[in-house]
Amino acid sequence: MAIGLVGKKCGMTRVFTEAGASIPVTVVEISANRITQVKNTDVDGYQAIQVTTGTRRDSRVTAAQKGHFAKAGVAAGRGVWEFRANDSDLEGREIGGEILADLFEQGQMVDVTGSSKGKGFQGPVKRHNFSMQDATHGNSVSHRAHGSTGQNQSPGKVFKGKKMAGQMGNKRVTVQGLEVISVDAEKGLLVIKGAIPGATGGDVIVRPSVKA
């Protein structure tokens, strides 16, 4: 395992290569990831680094969270994230320290995790890419319906996991194998090739690619 960074999706734009090719990119803002806890095998049963980022109003922080942040000596953030780590990842990482955008470098491959945009309750045509039924020729009301969902008296039920209408989006999604086009450590910006999950302003987790 390798540690990563928590950032905020700023939106998409494009950059041009020296040859004039246009590359679609996503800009991720990386505020300093403050280390709130370093877990080890003896105490916690596994090795990990816990971080927070951003700020949160004092009235929005629970008493337990206040104590946790105070013990680490860091300002309260908008959440807490954890990265599994090995011995080399933990070297030089101490509670209260910071992890910055320069953790990554240009040309590195990364995996990005975020929450996909919520679409609400959607039908099977939009949600599962089902084909529509006939527009006319005796079909009424069922143009975008999914049709039969079961068999007969045996099994006499609808199987779990059947593709039907329901909540779409707002799921944890990971896109793998994206290239880091550039890193601006001073401004705390990562420019990543392609699209990443979630809406503008949403939190995303950037890790070194597991398949690189």
UniProtKB/Swiss-Prot annotation:
GO molecular function list: rRNA binding; structural constituent of ribosome
Region called Disordered, residue ranges: 135-162
Alphabetical list of InterPro entries matching this protein: Ribosomal_uL3 (IPR000597), Ribosomal_uL3_bac/org-type (IPR019927), Ribosomal_uL3_CS (IPR019926), Transl_B-barrel_sf (IPR009000)
UniProt KW keywords: Methylation, Ribonucleoprotein, Ribosomal protein, RNA-binding, rRNA-binding
Organism of origin: Psychrobacter arcticus (strain DSM 17307 / VKM B-2377 / 273-4)
Sequence ranges of Polar residues compositional bias: 135-155
Keyword rRNA-binding: yes
Name used for this protein in its record: Large ribosomal subunit protein uL3
Superkingdom, taxonomy of origin: Bacteria
List of residues that carry N5-methylglutamine: 153
UniProt gene name: rplC
Listed Gene3D superfamilies: 3.30.160.810, Translation factors
